[in-house]
Swiss-Prot record:
UniProt modified residues of type N6-(pyridoxal phosphate)lysine: 270
Cofactor (UniProt): pyridoxal 5'-phosphate
Protein name: Tryptophanase
This protein's UniProt keywords: Acetylation, Lyase, Pyridoxal phosphate, Tryptophan catabolism
Length: 471
């Protein structure tokens, strides 16, 4: 198998879901009704759904079987302890709080860390800034609604689609330390390391970079939270690209990675492969006070701390999914599938970010240079792709980034990207070929695609529910 051109799907398909075909006229009407926002389309009207890989893929037979062990006790569930044991074995973290998904963890830990910094270091809430290699949208949103400014400190190669670089997700370490000094260390409530960096194109962060970032954080006594949605994909890239770790297992690399954070927050709907679930975990006793405070908030916002909004069967499934998501053959196939799609798009002249872990990212700014950033070229491209082929994708650019909450001005975005997110074990190579062919048709009509403007704009996380029209 090692010498074959393409790696086949390393699984057998046992259950299928029929999908509906639609006409171009039907799709044009549907996208207009949705306010030119693919998030608001009905799933029944989508032929290939590349909106997200979050909870949209298949599960393994071992995960499905694990659900039968679910203990639905309100408190002290046996299934909770199975999940907590998986966390200890994989990440080395001693304290676990389950949540319904990643944002459930964020709404708990962010206010707790801000309060802790205020009480212990005299944080000035009017001056507080949190740093990341690049904040995920909901992490940014929860920070902002708690009054915290966010600052992304990424390397210059990160968003240059013409550059190939092994670890485009890396922190700009000089920029990080300079930023901390600028705002004052006591006004930095937390640093978030996002692995992989979703907004940069699913790009990995090297272990060397994480070590250096953590050293800076410890110098200023700032807590580090690992945003862990795609921890296994990041470990795979480290194995492939960081020579020191080429002979390490994914499990060993993962354990090493989590030495360089104090907490982890996870949407388990990605690399842990579950339809619903999240985690908030603390490494050791030095964050026991944070754990205690977060448990209290969990009761109010998610559920009792030993279920956190999840049924017992879902916790059992997650306990297994954390392991299944680290399977080396599975990861090799998944990364190869993304690479295949990127290669196919570039062969027809569609510029992409270098292949990352979970999606192909099309450079919409280059495909639609006539549409300015404030008319959202990647969102316009998403609408055209749906009209042409019934494919739903998602904008990662100015539309998602939003406005400065203090000034109301559009935040400058480093790139206008369209994310083609591949759900796990759901679509085959034939689907990838269809997507590539769809882009041939889109490219032929690119000059006629129009920009977009708002008819309704929410103040926070606008990309989920905003409505637009063509300019």
């Amino acid at each position: 198998m090692e010498n074959f051109k393409h790696l086949p799907e390393p699984f057998r398909i046992r259950v299928i879901e029929p999908v509906k075909r639609t006409t171009r006229a039907y799709r044009e009407e549907a996208i207009i009704k949705s306010g030119m926002n693919p998030f608001l389309l009905d799933r029944e009207d989508v032929f290939i759904d590349l909106l997200t890989d979050s909870g949209t893929g298949a599960v393994t037979q071992s995960m499905q079987a694990a659900m039968m062990r679910g203990d639905e006790a309100y408190s002290g569930s046996r299934s909770y302890y199975a999940l907590a044991e998986s966390v200890k074995n994989i990440f080395g973290y001693q304290y676990t709080i389950p949540t319904h998904q990643g944002r459930g963890a964020e709404q708990i830990y962010i206010p707790v860390l801000i309060k802790k910094r205020e009480q212990e270091k005299g944080l000035d809430r009017s001056k507080m800034v949190a740093f990341s290699n690049y904040f995920f949208d909901t992490t940014q949103g929860h920070s902002q609604i708690n009054g915290c400014t966010v600052r992304n400190v990424y390397i210059k190669e990160a968003f240059d689609t013409g550059v190939r670089y092994d670890f485009k997700g890396n922190f700009d370490l000089e920029g990080l330390e300079r930023g901390i000094e600028e705002v004052g260390p006591n006004n930095v409530p937390y640093i978030v390391a996002t692995i992989t960096s979703n907004s940069a194109g699913g790009q990995p962060v090297s272990l060397a970079n994480l070590k250096a970032m953590y050293s800076i954080a410890k110098k200023y006594d700032i807590p580090v939270v690992m945003d862990s949605a795609r921890f296994a994909e990041n470990a795979y890239f480290i194995k492939q690209r960081e020579a020191e770790y080429k002979d390490w297992t994914i499990e060993q690399i993962t354990r090493e990675t989590y030495k360089y954070a104090d907490m982890l927050a996870m949407s388990a709907k990605k690399d842990a492969m579950v339809p619903m679930g999240g985690l908030l975990c603390m490494k050791d006793d030095s964050f026991f006070d944070v754990y205690t405070e977060c448990r209290t908030l969990c009761v109010v916002q998610e559920g009792f701390p030993t279920y956190g909004g999840l049924e017992g069967g879902a916790m059992e499934r997650l306990a297994v999914g954390l392991y299944d998501g680290m399977n080396l053959d599975w990861l090799a196939y998944r990364i190869a599938q993304v690479q295949y799609l990127v290669d196919g798009l570039e062969e027809i002249g569609v510029v992409c970010q270098q292949a990352g872990g979970h999606a192909a990212f099309v450079d919409a700014g280059k495909l639609l240079p006539h549409i300015p950033a404030d008319q959202f070229p990647a969102q316009a491209l998403a609408c055209e792709l749906y009209k042409v082929a019934g494919i739903r994708a998602v904008e990662i650019g100015s539309f998602l980034l939003g406005r400065d909450p203090k000034t109301g001005k559009q935040l400058p975005c480093p790139a206008e990207l369209l994310r083609l997110t591949i759900p796990r074990a759901t679509y085959t190579q034939t689907h990838m070929d269809f997507i590539i062919e769809a882009f041939k048709h889109v490219k032929e009509n690119a000059a006629n695609i129009k920009g977009l403007t708002f008819t309704y704009e929410p103040k926070v996380l606008r990309h989920f529910t905003a409505k637009l029209k063509e300019v």
